[in-house]
Amino acid sequence: GRGACVHKDDDFHIIEEALMSADAVIVGSPTYEFAPTGNFKVVCDRIGPAHDKTFRGPAIEQGIAEGKDPSQYPDVRSTKPRVGALITVGGARTENWLSLSLPNMHEFTFPMGIDVIDQYKYFGAMNIEHVLGRPDVMERMKTLGSHIVEALNAETEEERIRYRGDEQGICPVCHQDLLTVGFGGN
């Protein structure tokens, strides 16, 4: 099938079309109690499995092979390469209150295979009335945008997906400091 969401009475189609058209995305969310907002999570859940490249790619190939009308299989733009950056903002004065925000925000990019090339945690947002009062943060956002442009203009796939963020983290894939310790040999 097409992999379309069963919910039709909202504006998700606007977000979906913007994503299908985009070569890059910069996604931001406030942090409430360690994590992104519930509304952000709902969008992630709506993208979720229905937009997963591992589902859509084979469904598109099968639809084309069977000579189906494009309206009968997922949007072919689903599998195009994209890059992204993530930004989370919290009012707390310590970074710890944002600890699960960026890891959770990867739920937005992961299903569609969007390569996250930069990310930023802006904490202490309540210390100054407006972000414009933080030249260091404004400069970092300018750099983040430049990283997106660099990735889009890259001549090789390796250079396109290269992580450009300041924080390398423990994980070599998501560059987060979140580490899961499993028991039972996993």
Feature locations, PLM:
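Secreted/processed peptides and extracellular or luminal domains of membrane proteins
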Residues: 1, 11, 177-180
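Charged, often glycine-rich, active-site loop that binds/positions anionic groups
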Residues: 1-5, 135-138
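Helix-loop-strand module that forms the ligand-binding subsite of alpha/beta enzymes
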Residues: 3-109
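Glycine-rich phosphate/pyrophosphate-binding loop and the adjoining helix
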Residues: 99-185
